[in-house]
Amino acid sequence: MAEQDLGGMPLHEAARAAGVQFHEDAIPSSGFVEANGLRFHYLEWGKPTDRPIIMLHGMGQTAHSWDFAALALCDRYHIVALDQRGHGDSDWAPNAEYSLSAHQGDIAAVLSELGLDDIVLMGLSMGGRNAFTYAADYPAQVAALIVVDSAPELQQSGADTIRRFVENMDVLDTFEEFVVKTKQYNPRRSDRQIRGSLTNNLKQLPDGRWTWKYDRVFRSPDAKPWTSPDIVAQMWHKVEGVQCHALVVRGAGSTVLSQKTAEEMAQRLPNGRLAVVPDAGHLVPGDNPTGFHQVVEAFLADIPL
């Protein structure tokens, strides 16, 4: 099928438009690694000799969700943004195995294969849950933790809004339909920013229609992972077991993570603190890239690394 011009803004142009400060030669390399029985794709930025920051995206997203953050940080840090199982260009899991333990196994195996240790672990939403549970269980590997708009308990209304959005956009006839519906869902983003994001998140089917790259089991009406009371209680226990310095980041306009739960999250983390980013919803790094970068930089500068 012929390649199409989908109207997305080139990364550096989009970053400048969003006010992101970066070095002009900052571009990622794309790699693959066999780990935990699957083939994982990742984007790598910066020098391997610098402190590694591992970035874990949210449900339905890809490693490119972190492009702005990686651009801003890669002059001082070695960034590895991972396509988690079932997402982006990584393998889908056999038998739809997307449990917390499976994700933890992935992170451990990827770090081992890439020779990474003493990391800063950063995760958004689903990736945030994977990050704080991993930090609790592998304390020797995680020097610092950044959890973005995520906690053991989320606001059901906001989570349901996201689920309706993805369920109603399983397969559409044109790329333009995805652009229009995404703009309605997140009016904070410009059309060109949305196009750039969708270029990385969608794939074209042989019949010419478009769909999401990630495993459709995530957008099944029956898919409600990690919401049972037992699992929520287990995750709060994990939060209390995180030993490293930790930052909780909430978008001021988030309908997914409440201010009350964000405050509880920061309080129950033994070395936790909270930052609220204005002009941002759930997808904080893309909604307000400069605001997100400011709170991350302030945190990293204030802790012993």
Task: Give the location of each predicted region.
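Conserved serine/cysteine hydrolase catalytic core
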Residues: 205-267, 273
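Active-site glycine-rich loops that stabilize anionic/oxyanionic intermediates
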Residues: 58-61, 125
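Alpha/beta-hydrolase fold catalytic core
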Residues: 1-51, 75-77, 116-117, 297-305
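Short beta-strand element of the alpha/beta-hydrolase
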Residues: 50-58
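Active-site loop/oxyanion-hole signature of alpha/beta-hydrolase fold enzymes
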Residues: 33-38, 43-45, 67-74, 81-122, ...
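Helix-rich cap/lid subdomain of alpha/beta-hydrolase
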Residues: 2-10, 150-214
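Catalytic active-site module of serine/aspartate enzymes centered on a nucleophile-bearing elbow/loop
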Residues: 271-305
